[in-house]
């Protein structure tokens, strides 16, 4: 019996835990963990809106849709916009740590400010160029393919400019991949707060008033709904390259050669 208990103890004691003593490693794993959690909430809701929510709403009777929409979208938008903000803020801190490590390895720690400044400027300009392409238009201006091609060109150009500006012999694949993936995520955050939330806030209010007080929907409601749908669909498609580059940061070092 004693031998059996001893053997069992040896088996149970096999796992060995050794937590890193480096506080930077602990901070990074906590940042990545939070980034994953809130990113899943954000992108999960984005996919729900585009793959399930919007198509289902179109098939519902007006009376049912009017009662369901304010209740569902109020809760969904709270989670959607705040999880987006937390995801990006946590991601920016992690990105800054990657930049700082590369700058330290290059022998010029001040490079972190230049790299981050370039990154922020390029993606802000990219969003300013993308923004008008999301407005509902007429004819060719409201063609999905035209809109998709224009936005794709802007995003690709922005990504290439960031790679050129941030390239260097000590620049890591994680630095370059997150510069692109995080940049696209930043565009999505600006759309979440700058378009989708602004539109949905008004549509929720108008729909609730229409159901509870019989107030007719304003004439601009249809245009705003279309604008919000386009912005949400743009975020949906941007999420695919965003997720690829974020995953490639740690698991697919194909951008390191650009910095060589």
Please annotate each region the language model reported.
Residues 2-260:
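Polytopic transmembrane helical bundles with strong interfacial aromatic enrichment
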């Amino acid at each position: 019996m004693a031998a059996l208990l001893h053997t069992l103890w040896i088996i149970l004691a096999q796992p060995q835990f050794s937590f890193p003593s480096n506080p930077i490693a602990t901070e990074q794993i906590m940042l990545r963990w939070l980034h994953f959690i809130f990113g899943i909430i954000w992108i999960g809701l984005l996919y729900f809106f585009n793959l399930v929510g919007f198509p289902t709403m179109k098939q519902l009777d007006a009376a049912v849709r009017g009662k369901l929409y304010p209740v569902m979208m109020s809760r969904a938008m709270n989670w959607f916009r705040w999880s987006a903000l937390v995801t990006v803020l946590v991601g920016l801190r992690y990105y800054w740590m990657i930049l700082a490590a590369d700058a330290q390895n290059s022998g010029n720690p001040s490079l972190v400010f230049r790299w981050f400044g370039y990154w922020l400027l390029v993606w802000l300009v990219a969003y300013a160029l993308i923004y008008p392409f999301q407005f509902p238009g007429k004819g060719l201006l409201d063609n999905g393919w035209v809109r998709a091609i224009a936005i794709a060109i802007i995003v690709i150009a922005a990504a290439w400019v960031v790679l050129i500006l941030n390239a260097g012999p000590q620049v890591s694949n994680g630095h370059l991949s997150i510069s692109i993936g995080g940049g696209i995520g930043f565009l999505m955050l600006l759309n979440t707060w700058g378009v989708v939330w602004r539109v949905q806030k008004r549509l929720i209010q108008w729909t609730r008033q229409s159901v509870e007080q019989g107030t007719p929907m304003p004439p601009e409601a249809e245009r705003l709904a279309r604008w919000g749908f386009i912005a949400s669909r743009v975020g949906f498609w941007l999420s695919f390259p965003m997720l690829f580059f974020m995953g490639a940061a740690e698991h697919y070092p194909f951008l390191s050669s650009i910095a060589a």
